[in-house]
Amino acid sequence: MPDRPVRTRIAPSPTGMMHIGTARTALFNWLYARHTGGKFLLRIEDTDRERSTDEAVKVIFDGLKWLGLDADEPPVFQFARADRHREAAETLLARGGAYRDYMTPEELEAEREVARAEGRVVRSPWRDASPNDAPDRPFVVRLKAPQEGETVIQDAVKGEVRFQNKQLDDLILLRTDGTPTYNLAVVVDDHDMGVTHVIRGDDHLNNAARQTLIYQGLGWEVPVWAHLPLIHGPDGAKLSKRHGAQAVSEFDSMGYLPETMRNYLAKLGWGHGDDEIFSDEQAIAWFDINDVVSAPARLDWAKLNHLNNHYIRQAEPARLAELVKTVLASRDWPLEAGDMAVIERTIPFVRDGAKTTLELADNVVFALKRRPLELPEKTRTQMTEELRGRLSRLREALAAVEYWDVPSLEAALRAFAEAEGVGLGKFGPQLRAVLSGGAPAPDLAGAMVALTRDESLGRLDDALSPSA
Protein backbone atom coordinates (compact mmCIF):
# COMPACT_ATOMS: atom_id res chain seq x y z
CA MET A 1 0.00 0.00 0.00
CA PRO A 2 1.41 3.42 -0.91
CA ASP A 3 2.87 5.21 2.12
CA ARG A 4 0.97 8.43 1.46
CA PRO A 5 -2.54 9.82 1.96
CA VAL A 6 -5.21 7.89 0.08
CA ARG A 7 -6.43 9.48 -3.14
CA THR A 8 -9.15 7.69 -5.08
CA ARG A 9 -10.89 8.70 -8.29
CA ILE A 10 -13.82 8.06 -10.54
CA ALA A 11 -13.04 8.45 -14.23
CA PRO A 12 -16.21 8.11 -16.32
CA SER A 13 -16.50 8.71 -20.04
CA PRO A 14 -19.32 11.12 -20.96
CA THR A 15 -21.61 8.81 -22.90
CA GLY A 16 -24.90 10.55 -22.19
CA MET A 17 -25.86 8.39 -19.20
CA MET A 18 -24.35 7.56 -15.83
CA HIS A 19 -24.64 3.81 -15.44
CA ILE A 20 -25.58 2.33 -12.10
CA GLY A 21 -22.27 0.42 -12.17
CA THR A 22 -20.39 3.71 -12.49
CA ALA A 23 -22.42 5.05 -9.57
CA ARG A 24 -21.46 2.04 -7.41
CA THR A 25 -17.80 2.49 -8.38
CA ALA A 26 -17.98 6.19 -7.50
CA LEU A 27 -19.57 5.34 -4.15
CA PHE A 28 -16.87 2.82 -3.22
CA ASN A 29 -14.14 5.31 -4.15
CA TRP A 30 -15.91 8.02 -2.14
CA LEU A 31 -16.44 5.76 0.88
CA TYR A 32 -12.83 4.59 0.96
CA ALA A 33 -11.50 8.13 0.65
CA ARG A 34 -13.78 9.29 3.46
CA HIS A 35 -12.96 6.23 5.59
CA THR A 36 -9.23 6.87 5.38
CA GLY A 37 -9.38 10.67 5.58
CA GLY A 38 -8.16 10.87 1.99
CA LYS A 39 -9.38 12.62 -1.15
CA PHE A 40 -11.96 11.62 -3.74
CA LEU A 41 -11.24 12.94 -7.23
CA LEU A 42 -13.10 13.18 -10.53
CA ARG A 43 -11.66 12.86 -14.03
CA ILE A 44 -13.70 13.13 -17.19
CA GLU A 45 -12.28 10.83 -19.88
CA ASP A 46 -13.46 12.91 -22.80
CA THR A 47 -11.09 11.77 -25.53
CA ASP A 48 -14.00 10.64 -27.73
CA ARG A 49 -14.78 14.13 -29.00
CA GLU A 50 -17.95 13.19 -30.87
CA ARG A 51 -19.64 11.80 -27.77
CA SER A 52 -18.10 14.16 -25.22
CA THR A 53 -20.60 16.98 -25.44
CA ASP A 54 -21.22 19.52 -22.70
CA GLU A 55 -24.59 17.91 -22.13
CA ALA A 56 -23.04 14.46 -21.71
CA VAL A 57 -20.52 15.83 -19.20
CA LYS A 58 -23.35 17.53 -17.30
CA VAL A 59 -25.06 14.16 -16.92
CA ILE A 60 -22.04 12.96 -14.92
CA PHE A 61 -21.92 16.07 -12.76
CA ASP A 62 -25.67 15.89 -12.13
CA GLY A 63 -25.53 12.18 -11.30
CA LEU A 64 -22.75 12.60 -8.74
CA LYS A 65 -24.49 15.62 -7.23
CA TRP A 66 -27.78 13.74 -6.93
CA LEU A 67 -26.00 10.81 -5.28
CA GLY A 68 -24.32 13.20 -2.84
CA LEU A 69 -20.80 12.15 -3.86
CA ASP A 70 -18.78 15.34 -3.73
CA ALA A 71 -15.28 15.46 -5.23
CA ASP A 72 -12.57 17.16 -3.18
CA GLU A 73 -10.82 18.90 -6.07
CA PRO A 74 -11.88 20.42 -9.41
CA PRO A 75 -12.45 17.83 -12.16
CA VAL A 76 -9.64 16.92 -14.55
CA PHE A 77 -10.46 16.68 -18.26
CA GLN A 78 -8.37 14.06 -20.02
CA PHE A 79 -8.48 15.48 -23.55
CA ALA A 80 -6.83 18.71 -22.40
CA ARG A 81 -3.80 16.72 -21.20
CA ALA A 82 -2.87 15.14 -24.55
CA ASP A 83 0.49 16.96 -24.66
CA ARG A 84 1.39 15.50 -21.28
CA HIS A 85 0.46 12.03 -22.50
CA ARG A 86 2.70 12.43 -25.56
CA GLU A 87 5.50 13.61 -23.29
CA ALA A 88 5.23 10.38 -21.29
CA ALA A 89 5.38 8.35 -24.51
CA GLU A 90 8.54 10.18 -25.52
CA THR A 91 10.01 9.34 -22.11
CA LEU A 92 9.27 5.67 -22.68
CA LEU A 93 10.90 5.85 -26.11
CA ALA A 94 14.01 7.43 -24.62
CA ARG A 95 14.20 4.75 -21.93
CA GLY A 96 13.78 1.91 -24.39
CA GLY A 97 10.41 0.97 -22.97
CA ALA A 98 8.60 1.79 -26.22
CA TYR A 99 9.31 1.83 -29.93
CA ARG A 100 8.04 3.31 -33.16
CA ASP A 101 6.19 0.79 -35.29
CA TYR A 102 6.15 1.59 -39.02
CA MET A 103 4.08 -1.38 -40.15
CA THR A 104 1.56 -0.49 -42.83
CA PRO A 105 -2.07 -1.58 -42.35
CA GLU A 106 -1.47 -4.35 -44.86
CA GLU A 107 1.65 -5.56 -43.04
CA LEU A 108 -0.17 -5.45 -39.71
CA GLU A 109 -3.05 -7.53 -41.05
CA ALA A 110 -0.61 -10.10 -42.46
CA GLU A 111 1.17 -10.32 -39.08
CA ARG A 112 -2.17 -10.79 -37.34
CA GLU A 113 -2.98 -13.74 -39.61
CA VAL A 114 0.37 -15.37 -38.85
CA ALA A 115 0.05 -14.69 -35.10
CA ARG A 116 -3.45 -16.16 -35.08
CA ALA A 117 -2.25 -19.29 -36.86
CA GLU A 118 0.68 -19.69 -34.46
CA GLY A 119 -1.41 -18.98 -31.35
CA ARG A 120 0.59 -15.98 -30.21
CA VAL A 121 0.17 -12.23 -29.89
CA VAL A 122 1.13 -9.80 -32.63
CA ARG A 123 4.81 -8.80 -32.66
CA SER A 124 6.12 -6.03 -34.87
CA PRO A 125 9.42 -6.46 -36.74
CA TRP A 126 10.19 -2.87 -35.67
CA ARG A 127 10.34 -3.89 -31.99
CA ASP A 128 14.09 -4.46 -32.13
CA ALA A 129 14.94 -2.55 -35.31
CA SER A 130 17.44 0.28 -35.32
CA PRO A 131 15.91 3.78 -35.35
CA ASN A 132 18.34 4.54 -38.16
CA ASP A 133 16.34 2.21 -40.40
CA ALA A 134 13.11 4.14 -39.90
CA PRO A 135 11.28 4.88 -43.16
CA ASP A 136 9.58 8.16 -43.93
CA ARG A 137 6.01 7.06 -43.28
CA PRO A 138 3.42 7.15 -40.48
CA PHE A 139 4.05 5.18 -37.32
CA VAL A 140 2.46 4.29 -34.02
CA VAL A 141 4.28 4.16 -30.71
CA ARG A 142 4.02 0.79 -28.97
CA LEU A 143 4.93 -0.34 -25.48
CA LYS A 144 7.82 -2.80 -25.50
CA ALA A 145 6.20 -5.39 -23.24
CA PRO A 146 8.35 -8.16 -21.75
CA GLN A 147 8.03 -11.45 -23.62
CA GLU A 148 9.00 -13.79 -20.80
CA GLY A 149 7.97 -14.26 -17.18
CA GLU A 150 4.85 -12.94 -15.50
CA THR A 151 3.26 -9.66 -14.55
CA VAL A 152 1.71 -10.09 -11.12
CA ILE A 153 -1.15 -7.93 -9.88
CA GLN A 154 -1.91 -7.70 -6.17
CA ASP A 155 -5.58 -6.81 -6.21
CA ALA A 156 -7.41 -5.72 -3.05
CA VAL A 157 -10.56 -7.56 -4.20
CA LYS A 158 -9.35 -10.36 -6.49
CA GLY A 159 -6.18 -11.23 -4.60
CA GLU A 160 -3.07 -12.17 -6.58
CA VAL A 161 -3.64 -12.25 -10.33
CA ARG A 162 -0.91 -13.49 -12.68
CA PHE A 163 -0.55 -12.65 -16.36
CA GLN A 164 1.81 -14.51 -18.67
CA ASN A 165 3.87 -11.85 -20.42
CA LYS A 166 4.00 -13.85 -23.63
CA GLN A 167 0.24 -13.28 -23.85
CA LEU A 168 0.53 -9.50 -23.52
CA ASP A 169 0.92 -7.70 -26.84
CA ASP A 170 2.86 -4.50 -27.45
CA LEU A 171 -0.09 -2.21 -26.99
CA ILE A 172 -0.27 1.06 -28.91
CA LEU A 173 0.49 4.15 -26.82
CA LEU A 174 0.25 6.81 -29.55
CA ARG A 175 -1.74 6.49 -32.76
CA THR A 176 -0.42 7.59 -36.14
CA ASP A 177 -1.96 11.04 -35.63
CA GLY A 178 -0.17 11.40 -32.30
CA THR A 179 -3.24 11.01 -30.12
CA PRO A 180 -2.76 8.93 -26.97
CA THR A 181 -4.62 5.69 -26.32
CA TYR A 182 -6.67 4.87 -23.26
CA ASN A 183 -4.10 2.88 -21.30
CA LEU A 184 -1.36 5.50 -21.62
CA ALA A 185 -3.65 8.41 -20.78
CA VAL A 186 -5.08 6.65 -17.72
CA VAL A 187 -1.66 5.88 -16.27
CA VAL A 188 -0.31 9.38 -16.81
CA ASP A 189 -3.43 11.03 -15.42
CA ASP A 190 -3.62 8.77 -12.37
CA HIS A 191 0.07 9.39 -11.63
CA ASP A 192 -0.17 13.15 -12.04
CA MET A 193 -3.34 13.28 -9.92
CA GLY A 194 -1.55 11.36 -7.18
CA VAL A 195 -4.05 8.49 -7.25
CA THR A 196 -3.04 5.82 -4.74
CA HIS A 197 -5.94 3.39 -5.22
CA VAL A 198 -7.52 2.54 -8.56
CA ILE A 199 -10.96 1.19 -7.65
CA ARG A 200 -12.96 0.24 -10.75
CA GLY A 201 -15.01 -2.51 -12.38
CA ASP A 202 -13.38 -5.88 -12.99
CA ASP A 203 -13.90 -5.48 -16.73
CA HIS A 204 -10.68 -3.44 -16.43
CA LEU A 205 -8.67 -6.23 -14.78
CA ASN A 206 -6.71 -7.08 -17.93
CA ASN A 207 -5.83 -3.41 -18.32
CA ALA A 208 -4.18 -3.53 -14.89
CA ALA A 209 -1.39 -5.73 -16.27
CA ARG A 210 -0.79 -3.45 -19.24
CA GLN A 211 -0.91 -0.35 -17.08
CA THR A 212 1.46 -1.87 -14.54
CA LEU A 213 4.03 -2.26 -17.33
CA ILE A 214 3.59 1.40 -18.29
CA TYR A 215 4.05 2.49 -14.66
CA GLN A 216 7.19 0.39 -14.40
CA GLY A 217 8.52 1.66 -17.72
CA LEU A 218 8.16 5.26 -16.52
CA GLY A 219 9.66 4.48 -13.12
CA TRP A 220 6.48 5.40 -11.26
CA GLU A 221 4.92 3.78 -8.19
CA VAL A 222 2.12 1.41 -9.12
CA PRO A 223 -1.16 2.19 -7.31
CA VAL A 224 -3.19 -0.32 -5.33
CA TRP A 225 -5.55 -2.12 -7.69
CA ALA A 226 -9.09 -2.99 -6.63
CA HIS A 227 -11.39 -4.43 -9.29
CA LEU A 228 -15.04 -4.57 -8.28
CA PRO A 229 -17.44 -7.34 -9.30
CA LEU A 230 -19.95 -6.46 -11.98
CA ILE A 231 -23.62 -5.89 -11.21
CA HIS A 232 -25.92 -8.56 -12.59
CA GLY A 233 -29.67 -8.61 -13.01
CA PRO A 234 -31.94 -10.64 -10.69
CA ASP A 235 -31.53 -13.63 -13.03
CA GLY A 236 -27.75 -13.62 -12.68
CA ALA A 237 -27.12 -12.33 -16.20
CA LYS A 238 -25.12 -9.19 -16.87
CA LEU A 239 -27.26 -6.12 -16.20
CA SER A 240 -28.95 -4.96 -19.39
CA LYS A 241 -31.96 -3.01 -20.61
CA ARG A 242 -34.23 -6.01 -20.19
CA HIS A 243 -33.67 -5.84 -16.43
CA GLY A 244 -35.08 -2.32 -16.27
CA ALA A 245 -33.33 0.85 -15.17
CA GLN A 246 -29.60 1.15 -15.75
CA ALA A 247 -28.93 4.89 -15.47
CA VAL A 248 -28.80 6.92 -12.28
CA SER A 249 -31.26 9.38 -13.81
CA GLU A 250 -33.75 6.54 -14.33
CA PHE A 251 -33.70 5.61 -10.65
CA ASP A 252 -34.23 9.28 -9.83
CA SER A 253 -37.20 9.56 -12.18
CA MET A 254 -38.62 6.27 -10.83
CA GLY A 255 -38.87 7.83 -7.39
CA TYR A 256 -35.88 6.46 -5.51
CA LEU A 257 -34.11 8.68 -2.98
CA PRO A 258 -30.34 9.28 -3.18
CA GLU A 259 -29.80 8.00 0.37
CA THR A 260 -31.58 4.81 -0.68
CA MET A 261 -29.23 4.40 -3.61
CA ARG A 262 -26.14 5.02 -1.48
CA ASN A 263 -27.26 2.43 1.06
CA TYR A 264 -28.32 -0.07 -1.59
CA LEU A 265 -25.29 0.30 -3.85
CA ALA A 266 -22.98 -0.09 -0.86
CA LYS A 267 -24.53 -3.53 -0.32
CA LEU A 268 -23.74 -4.61 -3.89
CA GLY A 269 -20.42 -6.28 -3.21
CA TRP A 270 -19.82 -5.11 0.36
CA GLY A 271 -21.59 -5.37 3.66
CA HIS A 272 -21.25 -5.06 7.41
CA GLY A 273 -22.48 -8.21 9.09
CA ASP A 274 -26.25 -8.49 8.97
CA ASP A 275 -26.81 -4.74 8.77
CA GLU A 276 -29.13 -3.92 5.90
CA ILE A 277 -29.82 -0.27 6.73
CA PHE A 278 -27.04 2.10 7.71
CA SER A 279 -26.29 5.80 7.56
CA ASP A 280 -23.57 7.47 5.51
CA GLU A 281 -21.61 7.95 8.72
CA GLN A 282 -21.81 4.26 9.55
CA ALA A 283 -20.86 3.24 6.02
CA ILE A 284 -17.82 5.53 6.11
CA ALA A 285 -16.74 4.15 9.48
CA TRP A 286 -17.17 0.52 8.42
CA PHE A 287 -16.10 0.50 4.76
CA ASP A 288 -12.83 -1.10 3.75
CA ILE A 289 -11.98 -1.89 0.15
CA ASN A 290 -10.36 -5.13 1.32
CA ASP A 291 -13.77 -6.37 2.49
CA VAL A 292 -15.37 -6.18 -0.96
CA VAL A 293 -16.28 -9.62 -2.30
CA SER A 294 -15.23 -10.76 -5.75
CA ALA A 295 -18.48 -12.49 -6.77
CA PRO A 296 -20.91 -10.54 -8.99
CA ALA A 297 -23.66 -8.70 -7.15
CA ARG A 298 -27.32 -9.09 -8.14
CA LEU A 299 -29.80 -6.25 -8.40
CA ASP A 300 -32.75 -7.04 -6.13
CA TRP A 301 -35.75 -4.80 -6.74
CA ALA A 302 -37.62 -6.02 -3.65
CA LYS A 303 -34.73 -5.03 -1.38
CA LEU A 304 -34.37 -1.70 -3.16
CA ASN A 305 -38.06 -0.96 -2.68
CA HIS A 306 -37.89 -1.98 0.99
CA LEU A 307 -34.98 0.38 1.55
CA ASN A 308 -36.65 3.22 -0.29
CA ASN A 309 -39.78 2.85 1.82
CA HIS A 310 -37.60 3.07 4.93
CA TYR A 311 -35.98 6.30 3.81
CA ILE A 312 -39.30 7.78 2.66
CA ARG A 313 -40.63 7.16 6.16
CA GLN A 314 -37.56 8.85 7.65
CA ALA A 315 -37.43 11.91 5.38
CA GLU A 316 -38.72 15.35 6.30
CA PRO A 317 -42.24 15.95 4.93
CA ALA A 318 -41.19 19.33 3.49
CA ARG A 319 -38.47 17.66 1.41
CA LEU A 320 -40.81 14.92 0.25
CA ALA A 321 -43.40 17.55 -0.66
CA GLU A 322 -40.93 19.13 -3.09
CA LEU A 323 -40.27 15.73 -4.67
CA VAL A 324 -44.00 15.07 -4.96
CA LYS A 325 -44.41 18.50 -6.54
CA THR A 326 -41.88 17.50 -9.22
CA VAL A 327 -43.75 14.25 -9.88
CA LEU A 328 -47.09 16.02 -10.16
CA ALA A 329 -45.60 18.63 -12.49
CA SER A 330 -44.42 15.81 -14.78
CA ARG A 331 -48.05 14.63 -14.88
CA ASP A 332 -49.33 18.13 -15.67
CA TRP A 333 -51.23 18.24 -12.40
CA PRO A 334 -52.07 21.92 -11.73
CA LEU A 335 -51.01 23.10 -8.27
CA GLU A 336 -52.64 26.14 -6.73
CA ALA A 337 -51.71 28.44 -3.86
CA GLY A 338 -51.74 26.50 -0.63
CA ASP A 339 -51.35 23.09 -2.27
CA MET A 340 -47.78 22.61 -1.01
CA ALA A 341 -49.05 22.96 2.54
CA VAL A 342 -51.72 20.35 1.77
CA ILE A 343 -49.11 17.94 0.36
CA GLU A 344 -46.78 18.40 3.32
CA ARG A 345 -49.65 17.92 5.78
CA THR A 346 -50.84 14.78 4.01
CA ILE A 347 -47.48 13.00 3.59
CA PRO A 348 -47.17 11.66 7.18
CA PHE A 349 -50.49 9.84 6.72
CA VAL A 350 -49.76 8.23 3.35
CA ARG A 351 -46.05 7.44 3.19
CA ASP A 352 -45.90 4.21 5.19
CA GLY A 353 -46.95 2.11 2.20
CA ALA A 354 -45.13 4.11 -0.48
CA LYS A 355 -42.16 2.37 -2.10
CA THR A 356 -41.28 5.35 -4.31
CA THR A 357 -42.05 9.05 -4.52
CA LEU A 358 -44.24 8.19 -7.52
CA GLU A 359 -46.44 6.12 -5.24
CA LEU A 360 -46.27 8.87 -2.64
CA ALA A 361 -47.60 11.31 -5.24
CA ASP A 362 -50.41 8.88 -6.04
CA ASN A 363 -51.28 8.78 -2.36
CA VAL A 364 -51.54 12.56 -1.83
CA VAL A 365 -53.73 13.26 -4.85
CA PHE A 366 -56.95 12.66 -2.90
CA ALA A 367 -56.19 15.69 -0.72
CA LEU A 368 -55.60 17.94 -3.74
CA LYS A 369 -58.86 17.22 -5.51
CA ARG A 370 -61.15 20.20 -6.01
CA ARG A 371 -64.68 20.26 -4.70
CA PRO A 372 -67.16 19.02 -5.54
CA LEU A 373 -65.56 15.61 -6.04
CA GLU A 374 -67.02 13.17 -8.52
CA LEU A 375 -68.02 10.03 -6.66
CA PRO A 376 -67.20 6.59 -8.07
CA GLU A 377 -70.16 4.99 -9.83
CA LYS A 378 -70.30 2.19 -7.27
CA THR A 379 -70.64 4.72 -4.45
CA ARG A 380 -73.38 6.62 -6.27
CA THR A 381 -75.46 3.46 -6.63
CA GLN A 382 -75.01 2.75 -2.91
CA MET A 383 -76.28 6.19 -1.84
CA THR A 384 -79.72 5.05 -0.69
CA GLU A 385 -81.87 7.23 1.51
CA GLU A 386 -80.85 5.07 4.45
CA LEU A 387 -77.16 5.62 3.75
CA ARG A 388 -77.67 9.34 3.15
CA GLY A 389 -79.39 9.63 6.50
CA ARG A 390 -76.58 7.75 8.22
CA LEU A 391 -73.88 9.91 6.59
CA SER A 392 -75.84 13.03 7.50
CA ARG A 393 -75.92 11.97 11.15
CA LEU A 394 -72.21 11.11 10.92
CA ARG A 395 -71.52 14.56 9.56
CA GLU A 396 -73.15 16.11 12.63
CA ALA A 397 -71.22 13.80 14.95
CA LEU A 398 -67.93 14.72 13.29
CA ALA A 399 -68.72 18.43 13.42
CA ALA A 400 -69.03 18.10 17.19
CA VAL A 401 -65.55 16.57 17.62
CA GLU A 402 -63.53 19.00 19.73
CA TYR A 403 -59.99 17.99 18.75
CA TRP A 404 -59.51 17.19 15.04
CA ASP A 405 -56.81 14.59 15.46
CA VAL A 406 -56.50 10.88 14.74
CA PRO A 407 -57.33 9.54 18.24
CA SER A 408 -60.37 11.81 18.60
CA LEU A 409 -61.69 10.98 15.14
CA GLU A 410 -61.15 7.24 15.59
CA ALA A 411 -63.07 7.42 18.86
CA ALA A 412 -65.86 9.41 17.19
CA LEU A 413 -66.19 6.84 14.38
CA ARG A 414 -66.34 3.95 16.86
CA ALA A 415 -68.91 5.76 19.01
CA PHE A 416 -71.04 6.57 15.97
CA ALA A 417 -71.00 2.98 14.74
CA GLU A 418 -72.00 1.76 18.20
CA ALA A 419 -74.82 4.33 18.41
CA GLU A 420 -76.09 3.26 14.99
CA GLY A 421 -75.89 -0.38 15.96
CA VAL A 422 -73.80 -1.26 12.88
CA GLY A 423 -70.24 -2.10 12.07
CA LEU A 424 -67.91 0.43 10.46
CA GLY A 425 -68.15 -1.57 7.26
CA LYS A 426 -71.71 -0.37 6.78
CA PHE A 427 -70.61 3.20 6.06
CA GLY A 428 -66.79 3.30 6.13
CA PRO A 429 -66.18 2.45 2.44
CA GLN A 430 -68.69 5.07 1.32
CA LEU A 431 -67.21 7.68 3.67
CA ARG A 432 -63.77 6.94 2.23
CA ALA A 433 -65.10 7.44 -1.31
CA VAL A 434 -66.76 10.71 -0.29
CA LEU A 435 -63.51 11.97 1.22
CA SER A 436 -61.21 10.77 -1.58
CA GLY A 437 -63.32 10.67 -4.72
CA GLY A 438 -62.15 7.10 -5.20
CA ALA A 439 -58.44 7.96 -5.14
CA PRO A 440 -56.03 6.03 -2.88
CA ALA A 441 -56.34 7.35 0.67
CA PRO A 442 -55.13 6.45 4.16
CA ASP A 443 -57.34 5.28 7.01
CA LEU A 444 -60.45 7.40 7.60
CA ALA A 445 -59.15 9.35 10.59
CA GLY A 446 -55.82 10.06 8.88
CA ALA A 447 -57.57 11.18 5.72
CA MET A 448 -59.77 13.59 7.64
CA VAL A 449 -56.84 15.10 9.55
CA ALA A 450 -54.95 15.55 6.28
CA LEU A 451 -57.98 17.22 4.71
CA THR A 452 -58.73 19.38 7.80
CA ARG A 453 -62.11 19.76 9.48
CA ASP A 454 -63.53 22.25 6.98
CA GLU A 455 -62.54 20.27 3.89
CA SER A 456 -63.74 16.96 5.31
CA LEU A 457 -67.14 18.33 6.33
CA GLY A 458 -67.38 20.23 3.04
CA ARG A 459 -66.85 17.04 1.03
CA LEU A 460 -69.53 15.33 3.07
CA ASP A 461 -71.89 18.25 2.43
CA ASP A 462 -71.23 18.01 -1.31
CA ALA A 463 -72.03 14.30 -1.35
CA LEU A 464 -75.23 14.82 0.64
CA SER A 465 -76.55 17.74 -1.39
CA PRO A 466 -79.69 17.05 -3.45
CA SER A 467 -77.78 17.58 -6.69
CA ALA A 468 -75.12 14.98 -5.84
Curated annotation (Swiss-Prot):
Describe its function: Catalyzes the attachment of glutamate to tRNA(Glu) in a two-step reaction: glutamate is first activated by ATP to form Glu-AMP and then transferred to the acceptor end of tRNA(Glu).
Q: Answer yes or no on keyword Ligase.
A: yes
Report motif location: 'KMSKS' region: 238-242
Enzyme Commission number, as recorded: 6.1.1.17
Q: Where does ATP bind?
A: 241
Task: Identify its protein family.
Answer: Belongs to the class-I aminoacyl-tRNA synthetase family. Glutamate--tRNA ligase type 1 subfamily.
Give any Pfam family that matches: tRNA-synt_1c
Compartments, record wording: Cytoplasm
Q: What is its main location?
A: cytoplasm
Q: Which GO terms describe its molecular function?
A: ATP binding; glutamate-tRNA ligase activity; tRNA binding; zinc ion binding
Q: Which UniProt keywords apply?
A: Aminoacyl-tRNA synthetase, ATP-binding, Cytoplasm, Ligase, Nucleotide-binding, Protein biosynthesis
Q: Which GO terms describe its biological process?
A: glutamyl-tRNA aminoacylation
Motif 'HIGH' region is found at 12-22
Lineage from the top down? Bacteria, Pseudomonadati, Pseudomonadota, Alphaproteobacteria, Caulobacterales
Indicate what this protein is called per its UniProt record: Glutamate--tRNA ligase
